[in-house]
């Protein structure tokens, strides 16, 4: 995929598509630790708690930094969703991505995955019988009101540690079947198989449509105006199909750590991040001096000690450093 070897990538996904892996029926249940190593998870870092390891260091140490605050969690507050990401979940009257960066309002129709992925003010948080509040967020005025939700384990769960180091037993997913479907759809578009790509993306969207939606605290109604539909019109334009696949990748994999690397792989990191910063600077003052330098910021520098420690000339520094 990173080398643009589309036929090889397409062929490589065939064996996985024909295997015993598959999509979990419910999107929300995919991220419950009691469902670790389910049929969708292909490769994951295994985590556990209360297993005799000192300080519970087999737990999800990284995920503890996501803890959103409030009455049930510590307030580390890292990996905060941006307003731009929240807006990406807005949909049209037809239930398809609106591709709008206008700030979401309460009555807007939204993809139901938003409230499984992101903590939003006045939306129930997990199964805790409480509404997420903006003031849970660390440094609200600087970083905004939204918090992570997808990989946060309920404080009611026996797989969540309520004392230091506040870790959980939720495995860290490296590759899941949903992403393989997205890979295959991407390769299919580049190979001109647009209708197959549409059907693949519809598999992802159909799972989201048929999953349980977040409800109001009394369980009587959906917590927001959820709408999601399949792509019903055949795809005939490669550029439009490519954009649809990339958008679906962003929504399905949000906050799972893939977005930046996908932007680099697609060769659009400079444009997307620069456009993002132009608007997001007006929303978040800590970004006022942020910028993206093309042909540099796509990659981190190679440690000089590594370059100096091997045969001279064998490794050269990345561009711009």
Language-model features and meaning:
Residues 60-86, 137-143:
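Short, cationic low-complexity segments
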Residues 1-59, 94, 98-321:
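Acidic/polar-rich alpha-helix caps and helix-coil junctions
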Residues 90-91:
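Catalytic and ligand-binding motifs that coordinate phosphates/metal ions
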